[in-house]
Amino acid sequence: MGQPGIDFPGLGVGLVILRDGKILLYKRVKAPEPSHWSIPGGKVDFMESTAEAARREAEEETGLEIRTVRLLGPAEVLSQADRQHWISLLYIADDFRGDPEITEPDKLSDFGWFGRNELPQPLSEFARAAIDFLGDTDLR
């Protein structure tokens, strides 16, 4: 049948997590875009809503308890280097509990809170798309 994102376009989600005008970014270990800074996210499971998938993936990757998510917009990434194609819905959350941590060291190696003028490089295409959706009042 094949693998989503590799043999045919995959459906994914990403979650922008904001605190005090800063975005939470993680450094990826694996494809797509290894060594790039990105937002938490992943694939949507069968019969799972995209909002629930965004919450689940973010909780698994960050250790945070995500309370509410709101739709931010769509993103599409065609990574020629990794031969992956993902169509994702991006969500945003500023209502959460806990402190972020690295819960999946095989997937993510570092994290931090970043303002618009201190974004780490290189940024993943998903992170760039998410940041483009944010206004100056969201990300300072």
PLM regions and their residue ranges:
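NUDIX/MutT-family hydrolases
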Residues: 92, 101-133
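Conserved N-terminal beta-strand and adjoining loop/helix that marks the start
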Residues: 1-23, 74, 92
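Active-site-adjacent beta-strand/loop module that shapes the phosphate/pyrophosphate-binding cleft
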Residues: 75-100, 130, 134
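A generic structural micro-feature
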Residues: 5-9, 36, 81-87, 105-108
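Short connector loops at helix/strand junctions that flank enzyme active sites
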Residues: 10-12, 18, 39, 66, ...
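A short coil-to-beta-strand element that immediately follows conserved catalytic motifs
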Residues: 65-73
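Short, charged/polar surface micro-motifs in flexible loops or helix N-caps
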Residues: 18-23, 31-33, 45-46, 77, ...
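Conserved Nudix-box catalytic region and its N-terminal flanking loop in Nudix hydrolases
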Residues: 22-60
